[in-house]
Design a protein with these regions (language model features):
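Extended terminal and domain-junction accessory segments
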Residues: 50-76, 179-213, 285-411, 454-460, ...
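Asparagine-centered strand-capping/turn motif at beta-strand->loop junctions
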Residues: 118-122, 256-259, 404-408
Length: 483
């Protein structure tokens, strides 16, 4: 199967101008937005963790746990160059963790300590950012806060895992180059109380191939404006259709992350009943069904999938706008259904409803805008590029409303480090698909979003657009959350 090549007429034709400044009751696997410290939230009794066995998550090679002690997961990651054969059996140089793209699947239980011995065998500095994890800012992988790992050097990341969910890891130095070259991987934190079902992992990416090469080091005008959109679709580092066996009459949990530099994607499932049960890893009190699930850059969706009675195959497909108002479908996984058991009802996941937001005691505003043309585009927050920015200073453990206003007429998948938030409203509307806790949200052209958070995790935290070229060109700032 040849790699899918995307038709970009829709995005290329966009003229960007810059303006001035009866569902089942689910079960809990991640904390609600309460007053608990993140290092305490969601932890389980150590005996329970010790007795629990990590589920098998199919689709990705797992990292080797070097420590068999209960409550500790210890792995090694090495960033280096490697080669893959994505085009005509020719070698393409990539950057890889442990020689593979994506990197190995890291798994642990909520409450475990994760210890990662990282070695940088690249010829430039790098870090590892743990996207979505509420950990210490000293382990967050941001170079303004901790020193990057220099070529030939090593560093050990170590932290407790306060929250269950689907997360991922990637560098935070020249991120647009490093992620495009292949430095990315999934991290799954399990709650022993979760319903035991078959789990599958899908890391969805697109890369811009120039013949047999990837060369993200320079940005033309289109990449500066829209971000780097690829012409080859990868799922779990493969260009071919993934296949597996799926049992009839059973539910599965599919964990999906969009690790692309810039492309918003949608996903859908064929020959199955399916619904979204978690966003950014956190289980929803009320899962929802949609025709296609929106998956912005950096975000994660967990799907519950049940094969239809009599189905011979179940498929996952990525859907992309076709430039005419419709969608083109790209099949990426085909599961052959075995057995003849009848389809069950929906699983009761048991996530509790979130507590009602308390009255806001402080507010922050993030205005997203850009200016320039040709090959000198700047993307800004509150009229400032990163490095010349004014941090947002906020008190920890305080009900907070953060307003995000997009003045650029472009879309921005916006990510907050170190915190969870919920979407109060989008352009004055409360939408079912905006439910739950998350760390990333898609802000579309001219959107006005209000986010609610209680800032449970003190520290210096990045807030930025996850279109990696936008971030590289300035659309980053800091939130200083003080005790």
């Amino acid at each position: 199967m040849s790699p899918p090549v995307f038709r970009l007429a829709g995005s290329a034709a966009l003229s960007l101008s810059f303006a001035a400044c009866s569902e089942p009751e689910p079960r809990k696997s991640t904390p609600s937005e309460t007053h608990a410290e993140p290092t305490d939230s969601g932890q389980v009794d150590s005996g329970e963790v010790a007795d629990a066995v990590l589920p098998v998550v199919e689709g990705l090679a797992p990292a080797l746990d070097l420590d068999d002690s209960p409550g500790v997961v210890e792995v090694e990651l090495v960033a280096s160059t490697a080669t893959v054969s994505w085009v005509d059996d020719s070698d393409t140089e990539v950057w890889a963790y442990n020689g593979q793209v994506p990197g190995p699947l890291i798994q642990a239980h909520v409450g475990d300590t994760l210890r990662v011995h990282f070695t940088n065998d690249l010829d430039e500095p790098t870090t590892i950012h743990w996207h979505g994890l509420r950990i210490s800012d000293q382990m967050d992988g941001v170079p303004a806060i901790q020193d990057p790992v220099e070529p030939g050097e090593s560093f050990t990341y170590e932290f407790a895992l306060p929250d269950a969910g689907t997360f991922w890891y990637h560098p935070h130095v020249r991120t647009n180059v490093a992620v495009e070259m292949g430095l990315q991987g999934m991290l799954v934190v399990h709650d022993p109380a979760d319903v035991a079902v078959t789990e599958r992992a899908f890391v969805v990416d697109d890369v811009l191939m120039q013949g047999t090469r990837i060369d993200p080091r320079t940005m033309d005008h289109m990449s500066q404006v829209h971000g780097r959109h690829g012409n080859m679709l990868l799922v779990n580092g493969e260009t071919d259709l993934l296949t597996a066996t799926v049992r009839a009459g059973t539910a599965e949990r599919w964990r999906i992350v969009n690790t692309a530099n810039a492309r918003t994607m949608w996903v859908s499932v064929t020959n199955a009943s399916w619904r979204v049960i978690a966003v950014d890893g956190t289980l929803l009190h009320t899962p929802f069904e949609v025709e296609r699930g929106l998956l912005p850059v950096g975000q994660r969706l967990d799907l519950e999938v049940i094969p239809l009675d009599g189905a011979e195959t179940v498929g996952l497909q990525v859907e992309l706008p076709d430039g005419t108002g419709g969608f083109s479908e790209y099949p990426v996984f085909a599961g052959t259904v075995e057995g003849d058991q009848a389809a069950p009802g929906w699983t009761e996941w048991g996530a509790p409803a979130l507590a009602e937001p308390r009255e806001s005691l402080q507010e922050g505003t993030l205005l997203l805008n850009g200016e320039g043309g040709g090959t000198s585009v700047e993307w800004m927050i509150n009229g400032e590029v990163y490095g010349e920015h004014t941090p947002l200073e906020l008190d920890a453990h305080t009900p907070t409303v953060i307003t995000i206003k997009d003045r650029s007429r472009a879309e921005h998948p916006f990510h907050l480090h170190g915190q969870f938030f919920r979407i109060l409203d989008r352009n004055g509307e409360v939408l079912p698909e905006d439910a739950g806790l998350r760390d990333t949200v898609l802000v579309e052209g001219s959107d006005l979003l209000r986010l609610y958070t209680e800032l449970e995790n003190p520290g210096r935290w990045m807030a930025h657009c996850h279109i990696l070229e936008h971030a590289e060109l300035g659309m980053m700032t800091e939130m200083i959350v003080s005790e």
